[in-house]
C-alpha cells in the first residue's frame, strides 16, 4: 500500500500539473474524465512523476494509468522492484 508521504507528493504534482485543487485528487479520480487532463497534460504529468520518484514509466505503461490510484500503485511497484 502506498505510503501517505507518497500519496501526498503525488497529489501535489498532479495538482500543479493539472491546475486542480488537491481536494479533488482522490484515489478513484480519473485523470481525463474527473480532473480534465488532456493528452499533453498527461505526458507532462508522467514526466514529472518520473523525475519526482526516480522511476521510468514507459509509454505503454503510462497509457494504462487512468486514475490516481493507478499511478500510486504503479510507482509503488516500481520502487519496490528497484
Curated annotation (Swiss-Prot):
Q: Does the keyword Cell membrane apply?
A: no
One GO molecular function term of this record is: acyl carrier activity
| Pfam families listed in its UniProt record | PP-binding (PF00550)
Q: What is its main location?
A: cytoplasm
Q: Name one GO cellular component term.
A: cytosol
KW Ribosomal protein (keyword) present: no
Which InterPro entries did the record assign?
A: ACP (IPR003231), ACP-like_sf (IPR036736), PP-bd_ACP (IPR009081), Ppantetheine_attach_site (IPR006162)
Q: How is it modified after translation?
A: 4'-phosphopantetheine is transferred from CoA to a specific serine of apo-ACP by AcpS. This modification is essential for activity because fatty acids are bound in thioester linkage to the sulfhydryl of the prosthetic group.
**Per UniProt, which keywords does this protein have?**
Cytoplasm, Fatty acid biosynthesis, Fatty acid metabolism, Lipid biosynthesis, Lipid metabolism, Phosphopantetheine, Phosphoprotein
Q: Which residues carry this modification: O-(pantetheine 4'-phosphoryl)serine?
A: 39
What pathway is it annotated to?
A: Lipid metabolism; fatty acid biosynthesis
List this protein's GO terms for biological process.
Answer: lipid A biosynthetic process
Q: Which PANTHER family match?
A: ACYL CARRIER PROTEIN, CARRIER DOMAIN-CONTAINING PROTEIN
Q: Which family does it belong to?
A: Belongs to the acyl carrier protein (ACP) family.
Q: What is this protein called?
A: Acyl carrier protein
Amino acid at each position: 500500500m502506498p505510503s501517505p508521504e507518497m500519496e501526498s507528493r503525488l497529489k501535489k504534482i498532479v495538482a500543479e500539473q493539472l491546475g486542480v485543487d488537491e481536494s479533488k485528487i482522490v484515489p478513484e479520480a480519473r485523470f481525463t474524465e474527473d480532473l480534465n487532463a488532456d493528452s499533453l497534460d498527461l505526458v507532462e504529468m508522467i514526466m514529472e512523476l518520473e523525475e519526482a520518484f526516480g522511476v521510468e514509466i514507459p509509454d505503454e505503461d503510462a497509457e494504462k494509468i487512468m486514475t490516481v490510484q493507478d499511478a500510486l500503485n504503479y510507482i509503488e511497484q516500481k520502487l519496490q522492484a528497484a
